[in-house]
Amino acid sequence: MKFLLCTISRNNKKRLKSWYNQLSALTDLLLQEHDVEISVYENDSTDGTKQGLKTYVERLAKKCKTTLTSTDLGTDHLVGKEGARVTNIANARNACIEQASSLSQFDRIVFIETDVLYKPRQALEIIHYEGDIVSGYTTNAMGQFYDAWATRKTSEETWWNHGIPSEKTDVWSTFNGICAYSAKPFQEGARFSGINPRTDEIDCDTTVICEVFRAIGYANIVMLPINIRHPPTSLKERLYSYKQRLLRRV
């Protein structure tokens, strides 16, 4: 099999070292039995991300074909659910896919965020699990479910309110930091967008791609009980994480 590993990045300098270390280890594992290509797309960073990615991509390129696009589009760095934000992210994901080799070469396309912590061997389980779209689940530094907007159990939901999964769960949509997609829908024209084709409303880009897959007959979407963690970002999360580390030492 051949895998395309994709990462989009913007102002993630603080997370690049762990991103590289994990991705490098995962690539080594995959290369034992498969072909791998890596695609990285960055735009409009102002914190040193551009140079950091250049350094790490040069190292990854010694393992397999690796493409980096670093550009300045002049887009604002938005937060929340704004239509411009999800459109920017969707465009970045599409560019990341399209700058790689011909899509016809790949069996699976895997998106891996820069700001997640995971065990490479567990990521392998996600990547190899049979399904049209497969993910684990994300938690924040306090152990709470993280990717609640993108993850939905039914078409009527707009937010995940089902707690932490303890078993494989069929879902309407998912992403959760590491998400493996069958390449066939992309070969047939599926792309990310900020507009949900079923509701014609602004929606999470990674929810939208699940809707697009479903619309063309790829509806096997699952979330596995594999924890992908986000490091602490707020003061409250940092204090909680520090307290937990102290308790583990006792």
Where are these regions (language model features)?
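C-terminal catalytic/acceptor-binding lobe
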Residues: 166-250
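Conserved catalytic core of nucleotide-sugar-dependent glycosyltransferases
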Residues: 116-194
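Active-site-proximal specificity loops/subdomain of glycosyltransferases
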Residues: 52, 56-104
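Short beta-strand-to-loop acidic/aromatic patch adjacent to the donor-nucleotide binding site
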Residues: 98, 104-117
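Acidic helix N-cap motif at the loop->helix transition within catalytic regions
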Residues: 15, 47-56
